[in-house]
A protein has these predicted regions:
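Boundary at the C-terminal end of the N-terminal hydrophobic targeting segment
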Residues: 16-20
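Sec-dependent N-terminal signal peptides
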Residues: 4-15
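Compact alpha-helical subdomains of small soluble proteins
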Residues: 51-125
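Short N-proximal segments of mature Sec-exported proteins
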Residues: 22-72
């Protein structure tokens, strides 16, 4: 009986962890990166290369959908993103922050780089 309980507990906790649920710290960092991508997407095209704007739009779209799948409410996401955009709007493109966000997201979310690249190539963002 004790052995069965331990085995079932291990299976439950392993599968719960394997489902990819994010910690609150990871959710906040992902929201911050999504806000950065959103603000980057509003930088005028003449100021920033089009490929960086398109990457930002696709990343924002992918991450917003991902956060909704993770259980965050769309209104809460939009509210947070608006706060980040208010803070970052009008500031120049920060290559270092954007690169750090890319690395963080690609490491945190399996296949995120591939999915974002698909969005970029599809032209649907």
């Amino acid at each position: 009986m004790k052995k069965t309980f331990i085995i079932l507990s291990l299976i439950f906790f392993t599968s719960a962890n394997a489902a990819g649920h994010m910690s609150s710290k990871d959710k906040e960092a992902t929201l911050a990166c999504t806000g950065l991508y959103y603000a980057n997407s509003m930088i005028p095209q003449g100021t920033l290369k089009l490929d960086k704007i398109v990457h930002s739009i696709a990343s924002k779209k992918f991450l917003t959908s991902y956060l909704i799948k993770e259980g965050l409410k769309e209104d809460a996401i939009n509210s947070k993103l608006n706060g980040f955009v208010d803070e970052l709007y009008g500031k120049p493109y920060d290559d270092k922050k954007t690169s750090n966000c890319d690395k963080f997201i690609y490491k945190l979310i399996p296949e995120s780089k591939v999915e974002i690249e698909k969005l970029v190539k599809s032209g649907i963002y």
